[in-house]
């Protein structure tokens, strides 16, 4: 799951401001199993519940704000959201654009395609023979594709949409997080004819706050106590 940033708006304790407002605004995209809507239209998922547990400990409500992930650091630095908590991969670029907590989960980027085709593609070089590979713009999947030298990529607005491109046949494959691939492909899912094969990069998830925010250390401390 790393772009432009604006001037930092943190002028006082983020923790104090959040507690005074009574709300923690969390920037997310719809990304199962981390953040997605249930049948009632309510946000649920691993990161959703984790964020709500943190909010409860802070004594504030949690508001989930859908953002364009490709513009996430602008959303953060402008104050539109207080943090980014959406299966966000910790990267060197991210550390320059924001203040990120210690890792709370491990993951990997994987290539998803139709089960009937997966046996034909066993290496990253094989993937270069595909017509198109869908990726989420600004995601770890995009960086993994770049690192693998894949130029046959098409950008989607989210990982869920990248997966839809494969289901519909608009793309031959997609690169998404292992957590999503496990939750949304194979038997018992809506994409039973899809599977994943090649793992591209291992990664760790963290939560991003504004540069200089005291929420980073506070959240790292609270996460350690919750895990």
Please identify what each model-predicted range represents.
Residues 5-87:
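Extracytoplasmic small-molecule ligand-binding "clamshell" domains
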Residues 63-75, 138-140, 154-168, 203:
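Short helix-initiation/N-cap motifs at beta->coil->alpha
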Residues 106-113, 178, 182-224:
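Periplasmic-binding protein-like
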Residues 101, 115-132:
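Flexible hinge/capping segments at coil-to-helix
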Residues 88-96, 144-146, 167-168, 172-202:
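A ligand-binding cleft/hinge motif common to bilobed small-molecule-binding domains
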Residues 5-7, 48-57, 115, 139, ...:
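Extended ligand-binding regions for polar small-molecule ligands
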Residues 24-25, 59-61, 78-86, 131-132, ...:
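Alpha-to-beta junction loops
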Residues 36-40, 51-60, 124, 139-158, ...:
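Ligand-binding cleft/hinge of the Venus flytrap
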């Amino acid at each position: 799951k790393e772009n432009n940033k604006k001037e930092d708006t943190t002028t006082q304790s983020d923790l104090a401001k959040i507690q005074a407002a009574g709300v923690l605004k969390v920037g997310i995209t719809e990304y199962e199993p981390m953040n997605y809507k249930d049948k009632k239209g309510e946000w649920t998922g691993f990161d959703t519940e984790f964020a709500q547990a943190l909010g409860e400990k802070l004594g504030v409500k949690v508001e989930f704000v859908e953002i364009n992930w490709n513009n996430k650091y602008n959303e953060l630095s402008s104050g539109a959201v207080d943090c980014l908590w959406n299966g966000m991969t910790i990267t060197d670029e991210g550390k320059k654009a924001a203040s990120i907590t210690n890792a709370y989960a491990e993951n990997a980027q994987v290539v998803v395609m139709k089960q009937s085709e997966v046996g034909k593609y066993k290496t990253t070089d094989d993937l270069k023979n595909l017509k198109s590979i869908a990726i989420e713009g600004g995601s770890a999947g995009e960086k993994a594709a770049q690192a693998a030298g894949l130029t046959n990529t098409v950008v989607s607005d989210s990982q869920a949409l990248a997966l839809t491109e494969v289901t519909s046949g608009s793309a031959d494959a997609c690169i998404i997080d292992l957590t999503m691939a496990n939750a949304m492909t194979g038997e018992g899912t809506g994409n039973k004819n899809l599977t994943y094969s090649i793992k591209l990069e291992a990664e760790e998830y963290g939560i991003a706050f504004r540069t200089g925010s005291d929420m980073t250390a506070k959240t790292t401390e609270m996460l350690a106590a919750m895990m």
